[in-house]
Every structure is written in C-alpha cells, then in structure tokens.
From Swiss-Prot:
It comes from Ruegeria sp. (strain TM1040) (Silicibacter sp.). Homodimer. This is Beta-ketoacyl-[acyl-carrier-protein] synthase III. The last Arg residue of the ACP-binding site is essential for the weak association between ACP/AcpP and FabH. One of its GO terms (cellular component) is cytoplasm. It catalyses: malonyl-[ACP] + acetyl-CoA + H(+) = 3-oxobutanoyl-[ACP] + CO2 + CoA. The active site is at 114, 250, 280.
Length: 323
C-alpha cells in the first residue's frame, strides 16, 4: 500500500470588485479588444482597501473545509503559496492559522511566484507521504493589484486578486496510477532568467516596488517548459497523455494555455479555462481553476488531472493527481 495525498475539499474566494477591460480605457492607451486579443482576459477582481492576502486565503480555506465536511481542528498543516504576503514576516500562512482559530500544527509560506501552487502541492504531498501530517490545507492567494504600475499597459491589465484552496488527506492507495491523490510532481527553476519577471522592490530597496515583465521573452519559455514538465510528471506517475481528463493550467493568458495544450497534443475541450474571468492571479490561479472546475461540473471524482505553471525565477513545474 502507498500513502497518498488525496483532495477531499476545494474552495475559492474572489473579491467583490470586478474590473472590466473597458475601465482601463480611461487611463491607458488600450481597449477591451486589445486586451482580449492578446490575453483572453475580459475582467478581473481587485481586493478592497484593507482586504489582504491572508484574509482572502482564510476565506478560500473555509470554503475548502466546508466542502470536505471538516473543521480547522482537523488540519495538521497549512502551506500557502503567495508572493504578496501581508507583511515581510510573519508568514501569511501563520496569519491564516490564527484566523481559522487553529492552535496546533504548523504553517508556512512558499514563494515561487506563478508556479507557487505547484511547489506548495509538492511540499504538502511530501509532508503527507512522510507521515508528518495527515491533513494539509494547500492555499494559493495573491493581491497583485498592490504591486501594479498602473501606467504600464503591458502588465497592469493582466493581473487580478483572489485565492483558492485544497484540503489534502492521507489515504492508502495501491501504488498505481489508478490511485486517487497526488501521483507525481516535477519542479524546476533557472535563475539565469530572473530578470524576465520580477518586482523592483523589497527589503533591499526599502520599498514595495512594481511588477516588471518582458512578456514576449516569458512566452518564448512558457509553452516549451510547461509541456515538458507536464510530460515528465505524467511519466513519473506511470500515465500517458491519452489518459488525461483535464489540464488545469496556470491561467497566465489564453495564448500560453492554447500553445501548451497543442504542444501536449490535447484538445482545448480538455482544458479548464478561467483566465477570462479572473485574469492572472499568480499562485492563486490553479486552485481557483480547480475549484471553479468542480463548481462547473467539469472535474469529477476519478478524473486524471495535470496542473502546470511557470513564473518568475524562472520557476516552473507540474503535478499529476487523480481527483
């Protein structure tokens, strides 16, 4: 028998404020058509004043716990993927732990930008596989609206705020690709490309800074690296592309999503797409898409799912799991 990390609950949270593409036309040389044609994005959510990453993460976690029929007392650990924690420290994960009323277990943040949730899932899987935890909340949450340069039309129209969460539970499997739960992971990074996507602020500058991105260069890396990491994870899981029910990719933009599916030889009707409604929510995008995919009735128990993401670093990776 093999100890597996099985998804037993999913939930998400989106701020109330919805910003349509047309709102940017008043302040930028852009248009709804320009944004849609280049990104597939139609709208995004922005956090309200005083609404923080930890607040949104807590709301998503509560939704995941409710869907699983569990309480915060049942959770052993929280792994939170974010690049926009409320403060430099303590971690946003410990803030969520407090807001959920947890007084035991442990919590920590993972920072791999848009690839963060894949890294967080891999960490949570290791905690469960090794017996260090039986139930782990894995959360992706971001408030990228607070690191946007609102004069840069190439970036500020792309990103949104939100949070998504999964509750993983240890269950015994047969050790085959037919098991439920996380079957394989693949993580990668290459710091030579750190200047392609970064924030020009932080402790060393004593400022928050703004997101800076060489979008065309990131795109050049994205499709090749995402397809490659997905294939590697599938191979480690003992599964083939033909067996995949759903790709749930990082929702960066529709061109990367379409390009990766094509490179993998999979049709778009096997891809969960939410970028049109959420924009790029960085580490929150995959758990958001998983939760929405369940709500839509797309993702069902037993489905074989590939999640893949790439972000600043560059960092990229994939997780294969059976729902």
């Amino acid at each position: 028998m093999t100890r597996r990390a099985v998804v037993i609950g999913a939930g998400h949270y989106l701020p109330d404020r919805i910003v349509e593409n047309a709102e940017f036309e008043a302040t930028l040389d852009t248009s709804d058509e320009w944004i849609r044609s280049r990104s597939g994005i139609e709208r995004r959510h922005f956090a309200a004043e005083g609404e923080t990453t930890s607040h949104m993460a807590t709301r998503a976690a509560e939704a995941a716990l409710k869907s699983a029929g569990r309480s915060a007392d049942d959770v052993d650990a929280i792994v939170l993927a974010t690049s926009t924690a409320d403060l430099t420290f303590p971690s946003a994960a410990t803030m969520v732990q407090s807001q959920l009323g947890m007084t035991k277990g442990f919590a920590f943040d993972v920072q791999a930008v848009c690839a963060g949730f894949v890294y967080a899932l891999s960490n949570a899987n290791a905690l469960i596989a090794s017996g260090q935890a039986d139930r782990v909340l894995v959360i992706g949450a971001e408030t990228f609206s607070r690191i946007m340069d609102w004069t840069d039309r190439s970036t500020c129209v792309l990103f949104g705020d939100g949070a998504g969460a999964l509750l993983l539970e240890a269950q015994e499997g047969e050790g085959t690709s037919k098991d439920r739960g996380i079957l394989a992971t693949d993580l990668n990074s290459d710091g030579r490309y750190k200047d392609l996507l970064y924030v020009d602020g932080g402790v060393s500058t004593q400022s928050t800074g703004y997101l800076r991105m060489q979008g065309n260069q990131v795109f050049r890396h994205a499709v090749e690296k995402l397809a490659s990491t997905a294939h590697t994870a599938l191979e480690r899981a003992g599964a083939s592309t033909d067996e995949v029910d759903w790709i749930v990719p990082h929702q960066a933009n529709i061109r990367i999503i379409q390009g990766t599916a094509k490179k993998m030889g999979l049709p778009m009707d096997k891809v969960v797409v939410t970028v049109q409604d959420h924009g790029n929510t960085s580490a929150a995008s995959i758990p958001l898409a998983l939760s929405v995919g369940v709500e839509r009735g797309q993702i069902k128990p037993g489905d074989l799912i590939v999640t893949e993401a790439i972000g600043g670093g560059l960092a990229w990776g994939a997780v294969v799991l059976r729902w």
